[in-house]
Amino acid sequence: NKLRGSDRPQRIFDAVRAVIDATGILKGKRRRALDSTLLDDAVATQDTVTQLVSAIRRVRRLVPEAAAVSVTAHDYDASGKPVCAWDDPDAKAALVSGLVNDARAIIDALDGIELDDLQGDAVGLLALVAGQDVEPGDDEGTWRIAQRVAPDRVISTVDPESRHMHKSRSVYRDGYKAHVAVEPDTGLITATALTPANAGDGPTGVELLAGEERGLQVLADSAYGSGPVRSALAEAGHSAAIKAIPLRRNPKLGSDQFTRDDFVIDHLARTATCPG
């Protein structure tokens, strides 16, 4: 983390690249393979109540003005979760609404107050978790858990940059994603990146090739095969040897289905004609 937060987070690879350039070991090698892997986070995913309580406690601890705000949903100086009949939907809904109102009261009270970086980050995180999982309730001034998941949801106030990602429909992971660009013949890693787990492979892969000369052949799986990524590679002067996205049929609908290969594509007219 110290290296990542320094003014030269890529210093190790800068040194490696300097050696590569000096030796000329990659001279004439015009292929790069792109890939990524998920890195599990050590922190547990938090529910909405846990996030709200944790974020409010932190702001009250860091900002004296926040500690002076009157809050009623929970004793934030006490350890543990709020007292609640968790199997009672109405009681849980009332608690969530109260916590959100406490958070909003604190945020409103701090408007215009000068904050340092640590305090500002804590208040910003509180504002985020106070809104990402909820929506206005039926009565004025009330809130309820929204029946949707925020696209870039923070999963833990302990590690706000960690994200949730579905590896498949039934397999999911929480954490980060490591991306690499590799020269396949020598195995030398030419570029790396670390992103939240929900970051797309394709756009990050394009960034990994930003310092390369034109004319590479890019090897990758179908995660890098979107139209915008292929277009970006072409604009950068590279050719793509990327596995096509597999054809899939809905197993619940039987065999009378079309795939993309069944459509007639006219690139000049920019039309796609359905075979049906």
What are these regions (language model features)?
Residues 1-222, 227-235, 245:
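Polybasic low-complexity intrinsically disordered regions
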Residues 229-276:
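Helix-centered, glycine/charged polyanion-binding patches within enzymatic domains
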